[in-house]
Amino acid sequence: RDFTHTIIDNSDLFSESRNTRLG
């Protein structure tokens, strides 16, 4: 896995976490 892909995955996890908190 390349560095760019890792950043994208981290962004997705962060967005998903925020959405869960918002309900």
Swiss-Prot record:
One of its GO terms (cellular component) is extracellular region. Keywords: Nematocyst, Secreted, Toxin. The keyword Secreted applies. Disulfide bonds: none annotated. It comes from the Eukaryota. It is found in: Secreted; Nematocyst. GO terms for molecular function: toxin activity. Nephrotoxin. When injected intravenously in rats, causes severe destructive glomerular changes. At 24 hours post-injection partial disruption of the glomerular basement membrane, massive thrombus formation in glomerular capillaries, severe mesangiolysis and infiltrating cells were observed in the majority of glomeruli. This is Nephrotoxin PsTX-115. It comes from Phyllodiscus semoni (Night anemone).
